[in-house]
Design a protein with these regions (language model features):
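GST-like domain detector, emphasizing the conserved glutathione-binding G-site
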Residues: 1-104
Length: 104
């Protein structure tokens, strides 16, 4: 079972893929924003993810973020959360700027 990191670090869960594009964006956002995080990676074809999936959170998918008691999954939600929390200057301040960022 995956739970919040005892060190208070965020946990990022994703597939153990070389250059996995969806996981990399979250990593880039966390690094750019100066976050301290742990990674939990899963190997495709092994049962670890299948066995843990229901214990992480309801409706869990990869990537996911666990930040204390807050848990969220799905690529867009994870990216949006990381950007808002750690590097809000990247997502704009006006509705127009935010919309432009969302279309990227």
């Amino acid at each position: 079972m995956v739970s919040a990191s005892p060190s208070g670090k965020i946990t990022l869960g994703y597939w153990n893929l070389r250059g996995g594009p969806r996981g990399n964006v979250a990593r880039y956002l966390l690094a750019y924003g100066g976050a301290d995080w742990n990674e939990k990676t899963y190997t495709i074809g092994e049962d670890e993810w299948k066995n843990e999936k229901g214990t992480v959170m309801d409706f869990c998918n990869l990537p996911y973020i666990i930040d204390g008691d807050f848990k969220i999954s799905e690529t867009y939600a994870v990216h949006n959360y990381c950007a808002q929390k750690y590097c809000p200057e990247l997502i704009g301040t006006t509705p127009q700027d935010k919309a432009r960022c969302h279309q990227l």
